[in-house]
Amino acid sequence: MLYSLITQLIDQYSFLNVFKYLTFRTGLSMFTSMFVVLLIGTPFIKFFSARKILNPIRDDGPTEHIVKKIGTPTMGGVLILLGLFSGILLWGDLSNYHIWFLLFIVSGFGLLGAYDDYKKIKFKNSSGVSFKFKIISQILIAIVGIYGLTQLSQNTELTNLYFPFFKNLIINLGWFFIPFSIFIIVGSSNAVNLTDGLDGLATVPVILVAACFAFISYVTGNIVFSEYLNIPYLEGMGEVSVFCGSIIGACLGFLWFNAPPAKIFMGDTGSLALGGSLGAIGIITKHEIVLAITGGLFVLEAVSVIIQVFSFKLTGKRIFRMAPIHHHFEKKGWAESTVVIRFWIISIILAMIGLATLKLR
């Protein structure tokens, strides 16, 4: 929006040329998003607290959660999305269809998450919408988004699947690209949602993955860097780095209030939207497998739930004391802050491994 206005004035004011640089606008989007969240965060929390928009706590969860977390406002994802939209709408190139695809995904999943949070708050339990309703809704949103992407995209690489470490291993998915993409978006959304169970646990890994993909989208959209790294050159993909900057800034601002002890939780409004957007970014940058590496913590959390469910249904026994796996370690006696920081460390290591795959081919 503001960027579009500035581009019309560049010929008259040469100092505005700096806005042509993606790195500059990525920084602006990050700081704008962070500033917006920090600015409205405190009144937002007070408003939600006054209206009893509070987070329901699982009855079977760790006792400490029932004691310490009850009465904490939820739906902080609204804060994150307001910050994210502020950054990208001001500093993003809105003529780039990748941006509109990502905005559709983050909005669709954010609205679904908000409805889920509303149900939890209204009925004062942690169940929310049914699993069937949530999955079907996520799939439908992803289908519409992917269909729009395939109609708008001029990228011949869109249906290709690239493998890190193997520079010549490329599989054209053909029609299977659509269900594959749906799986990535829905899976990523739910994985982040499952991870969001402790103060700050999901926020920092989301920041790390978004930072990795800010770099990946930048080099993928640069013909010189992409050729040097032997990764596919995708025209216009650099603009996605501005979107990633907005995610980073919004989450950094939110972390100010979500750091232990959390003053607000992002709820499904935030976790479903952020997870869905990361999945969508992985798809359009053609780094889906790298997404699974950098976001390995989210994968671990999701897999722990799948293992727990299947084990109990098949044998009647649970592998973990509680799933997702972060609750397992709490049940073993780890302090919440210990679990969070150690999981952050794991996420940092995975992010570095993911970035290393760009060169190790």
From Swiss-Prot:
Subcellular locations according to the entry: Cell inner membrane
Record-listed E.C. numbers: 2.7.8.13
Cofactor(s) named in the record: Mg(2+)
Molecular function (Gene Ontology), one example: phospho-N-acetylmuramoyl-pentapeptide-transferase activity
This protein's GO CC annotations: plasma membrane
Family: Belongs to the glycosyltransferase 4 family. MraY subfamily.
Bilayer topology term: Multi-pass membrane protein
Pathway(s) annotated for this protein in UniProt: Cell wall biogenesis; peptidoglycan biosynthesis
InterPro entries xref list: Glycosyl_transferase_4, PNAcMuramoyl-5peptid_Trfase, PNAcMuramoyl-5peptid_Trfase_CS
Reported function: Catalyzes the initial step of the lipid cycle reactions in the biosynthesis of the cell wall peptidoglycan: transfers peptidoglycan precursor phospho-MurNAc-pentapeptide from UDP-MurNAc-pentapeptide onto the lipid carrier undecaprenyl phosphate, yielding undecaprenyl-pyrophosphoryl-MurNAc-pentapeptide, known as lipid I.
Catalytic reaction(s) noted: UDP-N-acetyl-alpha-D-muramoyl-L-alanyl-gamma-D-glutamyl-meso-2,6-diaminopimeloyl-D-alanyl-D-alanine + di-trans,octa-cis-undecaprenyl phosphate = di-trans,octa-cis-undecaprenyl diphospho-N-acetyl-alpha-D-muramoyl-L-alanyl-D-glutamyl-meso-2,6-diaminopimeloyl-D-alanyl-D-alanine + UMP
HAMAP family from the UniProt entry: MraY
TM ranges: 28-48, 70-90, 94-114, 129-149, 169-189, 205-225, 237-257, 264-284, 289-309, 338-358
Key words, A-Z: Cell cycle, Cell division, Cell inner membrane, Cell membrane, Cell shape, Cell wall biogenesis/degradation, Magnesium, Membrane, Metal-binding, Peptidoglycan synthesis, Transferase, Transmembrane, Transmembrane helix
Keyword Transmembrane helix: yes
Primary location recorded for the protein, binned into one broad class: membrane
Record protein name field: Phospho-N-acetylmuramoyl-pentapeptide-transferase
GO process annotations (BP): cell division; cell wall organization; peptidoglycan biosynthetic process; regulation of cell shape
